[in-house]
Amino acid sequence: MGDFAAKLQLYFSYPFVWYALIVGLLIALCSSLLGVTLVLKRFSYIGDGLSHVAFGAMAVAGLVGLTNDMYIVLPITVISAVLLLRTGQNAKINGDAAIAMISVGALAVGYMLMNVFPSSANITGDVCTTLFGSTSILTLKETDVIVCIIMSVVVIAAFLIFYHKIFAVTFDENFMKAAGVKANIYNLIIAIITALIIVLAMNLVGSLLISALIIFPALSAMRLFKSFKSVVICSACVSVFCAGVGIFTSIMAGTPVGSTIVVTDILVFFIFCILSLFTRRSSQ
């Protein structure tokens, strides 16, 4: 026990561990807030689609030699979120088809660019890190943490400011339109916030596992709670808890950060499913 405590104290003496915890917890909180809305609107896979777009944008940033890929990844992901929303409203192309079309195309272009114009000799390692976030969160700099904090504050503030409108759009968009409210504007806000979350989460779990941060906490909360507010609060608590446990386990056990967080989310989801069975039986 003494060796474990000494090892733990040693790890937390390194700044990169604190950076990883701060960024991880903020990203988990942001992704859980909007995850409930995306799941209820049956648009949860927009996270998967935008993450593939972000992967392609990172490849473009590497191609032009930018040291900070945020200048390319963020605007491209936001524009793609808007395009996904507009294309999904097209009668000829439904939402699922639009997501598949844009995400698969971006993923293919990104992987091709990384192979044709490699930024380093270890192409496989670069792709693995981008897709699964295996090491990037443990190599964060102080400037990365500051950017993450600023973007997280923007996301949380936007969610709180437009909370009631987001709630209305989630449950009865047609009524909002009939009442004269421009629901498309709030759908656009949801898409932009989602794009910001995707860009933030790239360093944590990689582009292939981002949807897990959005979906699992929301689904876990829905096992036990029914009201929108309760589900959002529970989802945020679950997401932050899983991120903290996942990062801590990853550092201590040497496992990949992203996959460890997702596995923790999956385990918590099954625990909530079991608890929901007991609560149903007790209520009967």
Enumerate the predicted regions with their spans.
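Membrane-interfacial amphipathic/re-entrant helices at transmembrane-helix boundaries
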Residues: M1-L29, S283-Q284
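Transmembrane alpha-helical segments in multi-pass inner-membrane proteins
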Residues: N203-S259
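Hydrophobic alpha-helical transmembrane segments
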Residues: L21-L25, M70-P75, A97-M101, V145-I150, ...
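Helix-loop-helix "hairpin" substructures at the membrane interface of multi-pass membrane proteins
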Residues: L140-P217
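Structural signature of hydrophobic alpha-helical transmembrane segments
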Residues: F16-A28, T67-V78, I149, V199-A212, ...
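Transmembrane helix-bundle core of multi-pass membrane transporters
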Residues: K7-L10, S103-L160
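Short loop segments and helix-boundary regions at transmembrane helix junctions
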Residues: V36-S51, F55-A121, A221-I233, S250-G254, ...
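Cytosolic-side transmembrane-helix boundaries in multi-pass membrane proteins
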Residues: T255-V262, I266-Q284
